[in-house]
Amino acid sequence: MIPVQYRDPQTEEILERRYEEGAPAIGARVRIGFDEYRVLYRWRCVPTSCIVYVHGVAREGRREVRPAA
């Protein structure tokens, strides 16, 4: 397990830090909190840590809202 930092590419803000089995692949989708992101690129990926830059992904389909019965 390696520590992975997920960052916003424009602001350098750290969105999340967590341990992963390996570095996520470029183009892979990752879930951070309740939002989904796509991996843009990885920086300084070494066997002991990895910094990953991600971009938010628009939700593809909205669930139909039904009134409570």
Annotated model-derived regions:
Residues V46-V57:
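Short, solvent-exposed secondary-structure boundary/capping segments
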Residues E36-C45:
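Short beta-strand-centered aromatic/proline hotspots
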